[in-house]
């Protein structure tokens, strides 16, 4: 008699891909991960596929209103998804998987508008095309359901952070330093998980490096290290009302973009470029530290993920800002918890695809401000 194959602990268990291209818009991070109910996720493969400068230019242009947007957006979405498909094929090859072994691909898309106060958020994507190119089920459009329920649609990672990084008896903060900074507060006991966007991170740091170095980012924070923080400029930047707005809140390039920076720099024409870079690095650190001091003063450990985790000058600035704010917390990357920082965001969207397949909520209403927890996403069958 043939042996029966062991059944998964939960019908949704299996291998999922997660794809995330964030506000830095330099490329897409992907992971292949196995989820089993009651067990820690197991990463089988990771990949990064960069974007050509022509695609980056198209994505940056769509951040601001312009002419012929529908045509430009659709063409950019198709080009974007072509890179997503390359990432999926690389994950499949590295992990040695057949298409039939992959339950679904969870893909975020590329945010080009985020205006929950007007009832919408727009992620550039073509999930139907991705399903066709990969012949795998695709789950996308995760943020819209939360916005429809009155939430900000962001951040969505805190529910995943709580599952993977929480520890009983210890208040932790997970800090994502992508284009925008956000934090997740894990209370370690009674109390709600909280999370929100703090302000700009690599969005402005990278833009300034591109303008003055001709490079896509400040490698290792070396440009900032050559400069000195200008206190008066930092105060002017921190005068932005978003920094003192109460959560739930979310932001993006709609607000924190080069035009926002230039408007404030107009009053400081004498500040050298390297000093501006040092001050932008301090802006990220101080805005995060102040939010932690206000909302998690007992935090003992901050774990950083996102591109900023590779910037030692930014991490040192965060340590200094936390000390100045009276928060006695250590600062490390999520690698200390067993998850490389470059994997965290893609892992979160693989997890959201897993939650969708199980028809379980993916948001935390206490984080986003939605009317309740909701199943997030939409299915595009292969």
From Swiss-Prot:
Q: Which InterPro entries match?
A: Anhydro_N_Ac-Mur_kinase, ATPase_NBD
Indicate the enzyme's highest-level EC class: transferase
Reaction(s) catalysed (UniProt annotation): 1,6-anhydro-N-acetyl-beta-muramate + ATP + H2O = N-acetyl-D-muramate 6-phosphate + ADP + H(+)
Record bears the keyword NADP: no
Q: Which GO terms describe its biological process?
A: 1,6-anhydro-N-acetyl-beta-muramic acid catabolic process; amino sugar metabolic process; peptidoglycan turnover
Do you know which SUPFAM superfamilies this protein is assigned to?
A: Actin-like ATPase domain (SSF53067)
Keywords, sorted A to Z: ATP-binding, Carbohydrate metabolism, Kinase, Nucleotide-binding, Transferase
A GO term for molecular function: ATP binding
Q: In which pathway does it act?
A: Amino-sugar metabolism; 1,6-anhydro-N-acetylmuramate degradation; Cell wall biogenesis; peptidoglycan recycling
Q: Does the keyword Transferase apply?
A: yes
Q: Which residues form the signal peptide?
A: none
Q: What does this protein do?
A: Catalyzes the specific phosphorylation of 1,6-anhydro-N-acetylmuramic acid (anhMurNAc) with the simultaneous cleavage of the 1,6-anhydro ring, generating MurNAc-6-P. Is required for the utilization of anhMurNAc either imported from the medium or derived from its own cell wall murein, and thus plays a role in cell wall recycling.
| Family in the record | Belongs to the anhydro-N-acetylmuramic acid kinase family.
Supply the NCBIfam families for this chain. Answer: PRK09585.1-3, PRK09585.1-4
Q: Mind telling me what this protein is named?
A: Anhydro-N-acetylmuramic acid kinase
Source organism per entry reads Burkholderia orbicola (strain MC0-3)
Gene behind the chain = anmK
């Amino acid at each position: 008699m043939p042996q029966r194959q062991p059944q998964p602990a939960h019908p949704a268990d299996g291998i999922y891909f997660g794809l995330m291209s964030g506000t830095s818009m330099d490329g897409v991070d992907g992971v292949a991960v196995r989820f089993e109910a009651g067990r820690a996720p197991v990463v089988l493969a990771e990949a990064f596929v960069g974007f050509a400068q022509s695609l980056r230019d198209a994505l940056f242009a769509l951040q601001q209103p312009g002419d012929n947007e529908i045509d430009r957006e659709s063409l950019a979405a198709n080009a974007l998804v072509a890179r997503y498909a390359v990432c999926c094929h690389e994950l499949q090859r590295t992990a040695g998987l057949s298409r039939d072994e992959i339950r679904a691909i969870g893909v975020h898309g590329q945010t080009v508008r985020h205006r929950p106060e007007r009832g919408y958020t727009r992620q550039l994507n073509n999930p139907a095309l991705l399903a066709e190119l990969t012949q795998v089920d695709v789950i996308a459009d995760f943020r819209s359901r939360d916005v429809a329920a009155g939430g900000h649609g962001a951040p969505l990672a805190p529910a995943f952070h709580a599952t993977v990084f929480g520890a009983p008896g210890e208040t932790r903060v997970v800090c994502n330093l992508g284009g925008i900074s956000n934090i997740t507060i894990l209370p370690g006991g009674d109390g709600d998980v909280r999370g929100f966007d703090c302000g700009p991170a690599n969005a402005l740091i990278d833009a300034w490096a591109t303008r003055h170095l001709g490079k896509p980012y400040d490698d290792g924070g070396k440009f900032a290290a050559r400069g000195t923080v200008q206190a008066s400029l930092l105060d002017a930047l921190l005068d932005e009302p978003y920094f003192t707005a109460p959560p739930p809140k979310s932001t993006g390039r709609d607000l924190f973009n080069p035009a926002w920076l230039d408007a404030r720099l107009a009053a400081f024409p004498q500040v050298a470029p390297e000093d501006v870079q040092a001050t932008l690095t301090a802006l990220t650190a101080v805005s995060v530290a102040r939010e932690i001091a206000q909302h998690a003063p007992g935090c003992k450990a901050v774990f950083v993920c996102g591109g900023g985790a590779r910037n030692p000058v930014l991490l040192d600035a965060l340590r200094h800002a936390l000390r100045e704010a009276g928060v006695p917390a250590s600062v490390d990357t999520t690698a200390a918890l067993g998850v490389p920082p470059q994997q965290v965001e893609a892992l979160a969207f693989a997890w959201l695809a897993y939650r969708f397949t199980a028809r379980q909520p993916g948001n935390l209403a206490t984080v986003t401000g939605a009317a309740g927890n909701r199943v997030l996403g939409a299915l595009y069958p292969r």
